[in-house]
Amino acid sequence: MARLTALLFLPVLIESAFSISFFLPVNTRKCLREEIHKDVLVTGEYEISEQVVTVHTSSTVVGDGSIFKITDSSSHTLYSKEDATKGKFAFTTEDYDMFEVCFESKCTGRVPDQLVNLDMKHGVEAKNYEEIAKVEKLKPLEVELRRLEDLSESIVNDFAYMKKREEEMRDTNESTNTRVLYFSIFSMFCLIGLATWQVFYLRRFFKAKKLIE
């Protein structure tokens, strides 16, 4: 069976948590991609329904389980689990990057599709404020204020990043416009030079043919 690959692209949103369920056919790889900022805590849980593999004498059914892997744009592995069925993961991003979460079924044969459930959180949603409250002995109101403070900081960072991107794009546009202007001026001088050369060449040609004085 041919190997299939499906990519689901997730946009960058202020909301920092999502839950998704999908079916994973045999010998198939499905991935989700999401952009996440630098120094952001990412946590999640996953659960994959187990494949029941029955071996018959007249059929070939091979079951190697499923592989769960998280990588960045440089193909660095942040989390990997073979024969994955259920688990949790957590990591902190080092740079702003595109991260890819992949599930791959290595089983071949006539077996049911696996059901995959994924809950992923990052930023404010990934923090365990109940644990923070216990460690720092915070009151419920103080915990809520801490959460709102972290949320506000996250939103400010998002806007700061968007402003930075806008400035970078503006600088790129200005640089491109300058290059186009210089190229246009250069092209104009080339055309003027070519036209002048043609005039003198034709003048000499006509004089040589004694068509003009």
Curated annotation (Swiss-Prot):
Residues 20-179 are lumenal. Glycans are attached at N173. Keywords: Cytoplasmic vesicle, Endoplasmic reticulum, ER-Golgi transport, Glycoprotein, Golgi apparatus, Membrane, Protein transport, Signal, Transmembrane, Transmembrane helix, Transport. The chain crosses the membrane at residues 180-200. Belongs to the EMP24/GP25L family. Involved in vesicular protein trafficking. Mainly functions in the early secretory pathway. Thought to act as cargo receptor at the lumenal side for incorporation of secretory cargo molecules into transport vesicles and to be involved in vesicle coat formation at the cytoplasmic side. This is Transmembrane emp24 domain-containing protein 10. The gene is tmed10.
